[in-house]
Structure formats: C-alpha cells, structure tokens
Amino acid sequence: MIRKAIESDKKAIYHMWKEIFAQDDNGYTDYYFECLFKCENTWVVDDGGEIIATLQRNPHTMYFHGMPIKTSMILGVATLPSRRKEGHMHALMREALKQAECEEMITLIQAYDPSLYKEFGFSKIYYRNRIAYHRNQIPVYTHLEITSEVKAEELANVYQAFTKRFDGFFVRDRAYYENYFKEISAEGGQIVGYRNKNGELEGYMVYYTEKFTCEIKEIIYLNSWAFLALAGYGATKCMKVMIHTSSSEQILKLLPGGEVTQYQFAMARVNDYSIFNILFDTSVQNVEEAFEICTRPLFLHEYA
C-alpha cells in the first residue's frame, strides 16, 4: 500500500538511497537525512512491513513571472532492484501529483532518465552550462578580497540581488544557507566570498577540488569583477577549472576561451492549465509555452 512515511521508515529509506544513489552520494545522503528529510514530504510503498519504493516532494517558493508561487521538487524516486517493473514508481508518482495538483501551480522533478516522466506531463525546462578552462585561460587577480568568512544572511542577500535578473528561481533565506553550509561540508567542498573595498559581500562561489580539477558548482556575483575575482581564485587551486552556471549567463563574454557543455537540470509540470491561464492572463497549452511567458532567463540550482 502507498502511505506517507513515518519515523520508523527513515532507516529503510536511508539504506535504499545509499544503495541506489551510491554513484552520486559523496556524503550527500547523510547530510540530507540529517538536515532535510521529513516524513510529511515522503511517500512509501509498504509491502507487508517492507519499504520497497519511495519518493519525496519538498516544498519551495518559486518566483515566477513577477510573483511568488508555491511549488515543489520531486526527488529520491527509488524502488528496490528486486521489485522493479511492478508499477510502484507509477503509483507513487500518481499519488504525489494528485496532492500537488491541489496545492501548487508548478511541480519540478530531478530526473536521471527524463523519458520516464514525460507521461506524467513533465518537460525539460531548466538547463545548465559546464564551462571548462585551463588555469592559464583565467587571469588571477589578487585574492585579498576573497574570504571564507561569510554569513548565511549575507549570502541570502547576495542571492536575492543576483536573482533579480532571472525568473523561475527558488526563493532562498537565511535558513537555506545555514543548511547549505552543512551540505558543502558533508560533500568535502568549500565556500568563499568576494568583498569589495568597503567590506561588502558582492559574490560567492561553492567549489570542490579533486586531483587536477577545481569544480565551481555555484557562482553568484553582482558584477563582473566579483565573477573574475572568484574564478581567478579557483584557478589558483588546480590545473583545470570547471564552472557551472545557468544556460543563459554569457560567461564567455567575461572569460573567453572556455569549452561549454550544456546539460539538462530539471523538468517541470503545470498542474492546472485553466487556473494558470487565468492567473497569468495567457492561453498556454503546454509546459514550454508556460515558461515562455517569463520575460527574464531561468535560473535554478536546487537539487532538493
């Protein structure tokens, strides 16, 4: 039977994640179950007391076309290998989306295999770029302005200012960044900020180093100098630098010579087109058309 999770299910769900998502773990699973897991956001398939499948739907506030709206991210869709192809994923998705249709306009999903979710009305909407540089391609400025001493409230303020040029993004607050610190630490990463001459934070980046590569998973900046100072700091760490950004940011204009690879990040679903069209005074008929009403480029970098 399908039901909401209870506290005694947590251990079984945790072990399912550790087995099924082992290739992408890097400490994230432990962080997630310590800081983000909530039973009220979790569905399970219970077969005689054994948890054989699960998914989670975490609520967020999205800023969409000039207004904040409720949304959620579906993640952690998992079935025990021995119980696959029995329809459990489909049943869980139908149950979760039935509730989503009553609570929110748009639902997102992190999809390992996007083809599995098209039948539920999801379409590929969010993309990100991965830009590869050799350290010699990045000018290294003095990093006296780079600091590891950054506060959650400062980061939230910088993110809020940065996202004014975007649409379709999740709202972040101080509590988000307090958890973000824990996530970065759990996965072996670092976060540093850039301060101007007045000591004001004007950007930050989250990066991970492995062998010869510095991977900048998130870089948020209020001006070109902040971006260049942070990227230059990354170039002091390793021979290769990989910078992840939204697909709309014109990074090559700031830092030419990089090799750009675009990848799909998240899918989206409109839960009720009639209400959507009334609310936004449109006549859209599919997800792509719904997001095309946004007058600014999309930004999203939440996994949960």
Region locations from a protein language model:
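Conserved acetyl-CoA binding element of GNAT-fold acetyltransferases
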Residues: 69-81, 212-223
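Conserved acetyl-CoA-binding loop-helix of GNAT-fold acetyltransferases
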Residues: 76-79, 85-98, 109, 221-235
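Conserved GNAT acetyl-CoA-binding A-motif
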Residues: 93, 98-112, 236-247
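Amide-forming acyltransferase catalytic core, primarily the GNAT-like/NAT-type
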Residues: 123-220, 224
